[in-house]
């Protein structure tokens, strides 16, 4: 498998998923949802194409917590994002997460380089970060 990264970032270095203002206010961040005004059909097609290539996901614990609280509840079979997120393997890097209730989740607790190398040696396509 190969690692693939898609990042939403402003010119001044702010990066955050295209969620709403309340998505992640940690550290006093008040600009959540900055991408929302720019989301249109073309953006949706772009995201659909990216998720269409996914064969697994690599998440940090914080992102996992956000995703796991939302995506398992979304069951639109016509939307590639929840279809892929809910069906494919998810690898979560964490030394604190005790268990993962989201189906298909494996917690990576060992040496990160060793764990990622092992994932990359598996057969398959993209592991999206």
What do these predicted regions represent?
Residues 1-128:
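Portal/gating segments that form or line small-molecule/metal binding sites
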């Amino acid at each position: 498998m190969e690692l693939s990264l898609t990042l939403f970032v402003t010119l001044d270095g702010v990066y955050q998923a295209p969620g709403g203002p309340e998505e992640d206010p940690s550290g006093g961040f008040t600009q959540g949802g900055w991408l929302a005004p720019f989301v249109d059909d073309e953006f949706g097609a772009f995201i659909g194409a990216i998720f269409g290539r996914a064969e697994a996901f690599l998440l940090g614990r914080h992102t996992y917590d956000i995703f796991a609280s939302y995506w398992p509840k979304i069951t639109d079979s016509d939307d590639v994002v929840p279809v892929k997120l809910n069906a494919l393997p998810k690898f979560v890097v964490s030394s604190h997460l005790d268990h993962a209730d989201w189906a298909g989740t494996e917690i990576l607790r060992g040496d990160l380089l060793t764990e990622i190398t092992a994932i990359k040696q598996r057969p398959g396509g993209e592991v999206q970060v």
